[in-house]
């Protein structure tokens, strides 16, 4: 066991481990230590200032789920965009679950929209489930507000997949698009442009959202 792994096991919460493992059926429970996210985030902040952190980021793949989450948190702290994107590209193929994939994006992405948009398009076109999901997450987080264009919805909505975690992200994206860009997103529901499963899940998520008005929710229920 490495020194880092020993430190992570000191932060273990076995009750949390049992609960969180049940939410990730594709991840071996033996690969989950059981460190709560706020605790791991505090650890990452201190760990990022050590030489051990730089070495750790070169040692892929990692053994534990928490090591992968720690890696993502370390990437998110990198302020230099070129270095950040380089580390992101190296790590994305190693993501093996939705929870690691959906951790907050690096803040420097927000200041480099032109480049990150092109990379998001490439990631969405990837064959790998979580690289594809990550690209969709970028579009959802960074391109549904002031930088939105109608054609961006098609980038995500146009993806056809049999993968549960890809389809779930499409639905999450569509529900968010309905909340933020109703006029551009609603035709995809009205005209049933999505697969049946994604269509229904998008409506479900939108109806559950506090950002959708009661009138919009009633209208969406009629489109099920």
Where are these regions (language model features)?
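Alpha-helical scaffold domains
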Residues: 1-224
